[in-house]
């Protein structure tokens, strides 16, 4: 019989961040208890505070991880698109489609992003969100080779995608746009 694998502190930290991301995505910063996070992660609350000094530290770690996932998504899709085309519009489109696939595969990525934006009333959280959002902007601009206006359009469309995705099942980008143009929203 082989002995059970003991997780390192780094592995346990990663598990706690993953559990926190799920809880914070649903309940937000203020509405999520560290007890719920500890239970989901399978650790005690005192151990959670050993790993992360405060609830805010844990929230910030989850937000950073969420932005890193989004950045990796943009980097990977941008690099692949650049092998097929040097046209910035084509590269941006590929990155946008990859982002939609990321949100569809893991809706908590979007939910946590939105919770991060909502928690920006806190100066420390705002600083982390701002820095990471700027890094996303820089990554998209550099990888796509697009001019600043095109990058601005990419992020504006991304925010619209975020709104449509957060509305929930049954609403598509196309029928949402139709409703913005004067029709009634249609549920699929």
What are the functions of these language-model segments?
Residues 103-121:
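Amphipathic alpha-helical segments used for helix-helix packing
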Residues 1-11, 182-188:
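Actinobacteria-biased recognition of intrinsically disordered, low-complexity terminal regions
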Residues 64-70:
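Short, basic, alpha-helical segments at the C-terminal edge of helix-turn-helix-like DNA-binding modules
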Residues 99, 113-117, 154-158:
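Short alpha-helical scaffolding segments that buttress acidic/His motifs in well-ordered protein cores
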Residues 12-15, 19, 23-57, 61:
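Helix-turn-helix
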Residues 122-188:
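Hydrophobic/aromatic-rich alpha-helical bundle segments in the mid-to-C-terminal region
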Residues 61, 72-105:
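Hydrophobic alpha-helical connector segments
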Residues 19, 23-26, 73-80, 112-116:
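Solvent-exposed, amphipathic alpha-helical segments
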